[in-house]
């Protein structure tokens, strides 16, 4: 799988999910906190730069292996 760069559109800490806007202008991608590769509390900030892979989830594309840049 190839890595894609993007920016966090929004992320709801209490619900544990949000969306990432890919740099290539493609459709926003769903992200769940379990896909975030970090130690401690897994969260993302609006506008944060990230790198991720896309997998096909039950409800469409979702981000996997999300790394903060």
From Swiss-Prot:
* CDD domains listed in its UniProt record: CSP_CDS (cd04458)
Cellular component, GO annotation:
cytosol
What is a single Pfam family found in this protein's UniProt entry? CSD
Assigned keywords, A-Z: Activator, Cytoplasm, DNA-binding, Transcription, Transcription regulation
Q: What PROSITE patterns does its record include?
A: CSD_1, CSD_2
Q: Where in the cell is it found?
A: Cytoplasm
Stretches that traverse the bilayer: none
Identify a single GO molecular function assigned to this protein: DNA binding
**Which residue intervals define the domain CSD in the entry?**
6-66
Record has Cytoplasm as a keyword: yes
Protein name, as recorded: Cold shock-like protein CspE
* Gene that encodes the chain: cspE
């Amino acid at each position: 799988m190839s890595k894609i760069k993007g920016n966090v559109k929004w992320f709801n800490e209490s619900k544990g999910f949000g969306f990432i806007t890919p740099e290539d202008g493609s459709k926003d991608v769903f992200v769940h906190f379990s896909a975030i590769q970090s130690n401690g509390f897994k969260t993302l900030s609006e506008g944060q730069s990230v790198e991720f892979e896309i997998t096909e989830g039950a409800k469409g594309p979702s981000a996997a292996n999300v790394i903060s840049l």
